[in-house]
């Protein structure tokens, strides 16, 4: 609801006619405007389109294949998972208990992974595919991945070409089912509104009159998640705390790093992906 104090009242001077010669024209324009409003309203009514439906329309979600990994904090949200798996490893599902340094696109393929390559959307997508050539292919955001694959998006924070700030990449992955751990004070309405899903779906997942703190609610939900390097567990929210429906429209500004450059979308096989230095290089018997 708008704060009435933020809406200035129109003064008599501001609302008065400054040029009486244009009164007739304004009246004619008003008649045309009213006619247009009537025609629009008549069209909406005849087609069973109501204002309440328009303002409550759910956000457009990108298609899913049905092979998306479930969103969960299990493993990834624990200390070992947080400290050894960055956004790239998380997005492609390559969980490791110990890594000496963060996974970089192209590293497993033996390609040049110097910092300057992080500034090029022409280079990075090819490096991602090269790491798992038989299990990753370039797609587009609106395309449904084939069965057994799910969507991943990559963005860049361009940065400045210096030794200390070379830009950075960031990945998001799609889910069709989420696990949510109910917190004290949560209501089903609050959870449903946050995820933008039907209330009945969340209530069914809860199974009780109100959410029991600590209970894991599992329900269908088409969203994206990400992981901020080795600093966080899996996140369903963007830089402004909103659930991520489409990463391209989400806030990605984290101050020093602003991942505002959409680079590419991929379809990733939902098992068997390996990235980084902890695995054998891609060869005839790998991929």
Summary of predicted features, one role per range:
Residues 178-181, 190-221:
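Extracellular LysM carbohydrate-binding repeats and other cell-envelope/extracellular binding modules
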Residues 58-135:
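Cysteine-nucleophile protease catalytic domains, especially the papain-like/related folds used
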Residues 213-287:
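Active-site or metal-binding loop neighborhoods of secreted/extracellular toxin and effector enzymes
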Residues 38-53:
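Short, positively charged and aromatic/hydrophobic N-terminal segments
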Residues 4, 9-32:
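Intrinsically disordered, low-complexity, charge-rich segments with an acidic bias
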Residues 183-185:
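Short gly/acidic/polar-rich coil/turn motifs that serve as flexible hinges in modular proteins
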Residues 116-177, 221-231:
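...with weaker cross-activation on analogous glycine-rich loops/strands in unrelated enzymes
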């Amino acid at each position: 609801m708008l704060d009435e104090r933020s809406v200035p009242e129109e003064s008599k001077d501001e609302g008065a006619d400054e040029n009486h010669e244009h009164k007739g024209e304004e009246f004619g324009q008003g008649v045309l405007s009213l006619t247009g409003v009537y025609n629009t309203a008549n069209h909406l009514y005849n087609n069973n389109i109501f204002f309440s439906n328009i303002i409550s329309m759910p956000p457009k979600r990108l298609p899913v294949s049905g092979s998306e990994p479930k969103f969960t904090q299990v493993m990834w949200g624990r200390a070992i998972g947080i400290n050894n798996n960055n956004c790239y490893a998380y997005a492609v599902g390559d969980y490791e208990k110990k890594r000496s340094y963060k996974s970089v696109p192209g590293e497993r393929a033996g390609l040049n992974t110097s910092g300057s390559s992080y500034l090029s959307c022409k280079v990075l997508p090819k490096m991602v595919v090269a790491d798992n050539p038989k299990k990753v292919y370039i797609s587009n955001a609106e395309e449904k991945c084939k069965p057994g694959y799910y969507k991943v998006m990559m963005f860049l924070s361009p940065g400045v070409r210096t030794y200390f700030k070379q830009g950075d990449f960031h990945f998001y992955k799609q889910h069709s089912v989420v696990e949510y751990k109910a917190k004290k004070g949560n209501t089903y309405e609050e959870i449903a509104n946050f995820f933008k899903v039907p209330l009945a779906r969340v209530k069914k997942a809860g199974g009780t009159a109100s959410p029991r703190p600590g209970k894991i609610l599992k329900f269908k939900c088409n969203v994206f998640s990400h992981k901020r390097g080795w600093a966080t567990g899996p996140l369903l929210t963007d830089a402004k705390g909103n659930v991520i429906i489409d990463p391209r429209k989400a806030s990605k500004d984290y101050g020093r790093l602003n991942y505002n450059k959409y680079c590419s979308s991929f379809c990733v096989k939902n098992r068997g992906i390996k990235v980084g230095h902890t695995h054998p290089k891609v060869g005839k018997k790998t991929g």
